[in-house]
A protein has these predicted regions:
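Conserved active-site loop/cleft motifs that coordinate metal ions or position small ligands
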Residues: 4
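Glycine-rich beta-alpha loop segments
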Residues: 7-10, 14-138
Length: 138
């Protein structure tokens, strides 16, 4: 039987899920435009406020190993939605033409290797491959 205490806990959980900076029920994979929403290449400071950075900062502020029950749930729901979106993506895209390059926020966008990865990704895309990245917060 659901008690009044349970209902209050559920309400707190739903309130928390509404305030995270990412969509816990995203139905499609993120595009570069979505991830860099708010970023203006002519204004380096705008990177601090783009979507990708906001999500990463949220991740850091709530702990790499989350100890907040609601945060743990929000991450699991988001991961599940991305997993589902990836399965949908592969229904219409040949896995043999998909390439993933994993990295992290430690590599600065001004680093020489970052530029090399961007140019490699650009060339592979021009050759008809789909570039997939991710797996990390923000």
């Amino acid at each position: 039987m659901i008690t009044e205490t349970d209902i209050k806990r559920f309400e707190r959980t739903f309130d928390y899920l509404k305030q995270v900076p990412y969509d816990i029920s995203k139905e499609t994979l993120y595009t570069a435009l979505e991830l860099y929403n708010g970023y203006n290449p002519d204004n380096a400071d705008s990177f601090k406020t783009c979507f990708d950075t906001k999500v990463y900062n949220h991740y850091i502020s709530t702990g790499k190993i989350d100890t907040i029950e609601e945060e743990s749930l929000s991450r699991m729901l988001h991961d599940h939605s991305i997993h589902t979106a990836l399965k949908e993506f592969f229904k219409t895209h040949n896995k043999q033409h998909c390439i993933g390059i994993m990295g992290g926020h430690a590599l600065q966008r001004t680093d020489y290797m970052y530029k090399k990865i961007v140019l490699l990704s650009k060339r592979l895309t021009e050759l008809g491959f789909y570039m997939l990245s991710g797996g990390g917060p923000g």
